[in-house]
């Protein structure tokens, strides 16, 4: 490991109900100074089928959380009620109301507890980021808790389960498609946006169809809300290095209030895979070639 590596801290906290124990991880910068104030970033997934507080650290999400911390943030991962690998009652707490998976109220309660224990965690500057179900929960956080979450980056979010796979949406939201589906849809709360929201999506995404982000985008437009949108014409259910760099810039600028490096080059595994495919002679251009059938 790098000499400056700082392992995340495991924490036990109390859920918003005041009695249920929830678990979390806290990532701090390698040069952490308890005398300073650090904005907090909540790295969320929120899908009922998984949990973030692990017995090991092999998942790429931990590297992303640690990378954000190195930019001068305290990054937290919290397994609120409705996530997996606990009791049946804990796991199924979000059934029929998937918007409560990992429970944003629990996340808010946890961050407030962490700020009270360590004042270096600036509870007045809280951001949130997530991918896929985490993108859904990130937008939900900005729309349902606009006074707490100030900046959010929602990547590839399934913002309405009516547009998502029935093997995920109906599995956790239930059937028939009734009023509860209106309650889970982020567009229902578009009028509440106050903070800075960046929506990110790949236009070739077959995991979460781009219609999900376009629907939310239109709802925000209908309510005359300011937001940011970053689309990738060649990306599927993934984000290239350029997208990661832009998310870093977004937090540095809007949450930390500092200047980000201009056009810093960052490559992801996706970028290297595309370079490898191109080197094999595969043409990645989608335009039709002369003489091909139309």
What is each PLM-predicted segment?
Residues 1-294:
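Serine-hydrolase catalytic core recognition
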């Amino acid at each position: 490991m790098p000499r400056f590596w700082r392992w995340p801290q495991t924490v036990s906290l109390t859920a918003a109900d005041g009695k249920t124990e929830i678990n979390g991880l806290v990532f701090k910068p390698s040069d952490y100074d308890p005398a300073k104030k650090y904005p907090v970033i909540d790295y969320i997934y929120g899908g009922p089928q998984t949990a973030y507080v692990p017995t090991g650290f092999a998942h790429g999400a931990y590297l992303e959380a640690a990378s954000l911390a190195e930019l001068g943030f305290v990054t937290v991962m919290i397994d609120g009620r409705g996530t997996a690998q606990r009791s049946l009652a804990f796991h199924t707490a979000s059934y029929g109301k998937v918007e409560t998976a990992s429970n944003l109220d629990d996340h808010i309660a946890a961050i407030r507890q962490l700020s009270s224990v360590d004042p270096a965690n600036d509870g007045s500057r809280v951001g949130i980021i997530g991918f896929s179900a985490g993108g859904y929960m990130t937008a939900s956080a900005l729309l349902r808790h606009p006074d707490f979450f100030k900046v959010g980056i929602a990547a590839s979010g399934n913002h309405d389960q009516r547009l998502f796979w029935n093997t995920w949406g109906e599995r956790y939201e239930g059937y028939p498609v009734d009023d509860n589906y209106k309650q889970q849809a982020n567009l229902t709360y578009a009028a509440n946006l106050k903070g800075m929201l960046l929506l990110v999506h790949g236009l070739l995404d077959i995991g979460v169809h781009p219609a999900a982000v376009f629907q939310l985008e239109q709802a925000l437009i209908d309510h005359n809300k300011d937001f940011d949108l970053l689309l990738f014409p060649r990306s599927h259910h993934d984000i290239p290095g350029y997208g990661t760099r832009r998310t870093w810039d977004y937090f540095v600028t809007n949450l930390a209030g500092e200047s980000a490096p201009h056009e810093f080059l960052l490559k992801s595994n996706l970028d290297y895979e595309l370079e490898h495919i191109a080197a094999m002679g595969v043409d990645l251009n989608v335009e039709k070639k002369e003489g091909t059938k139309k």
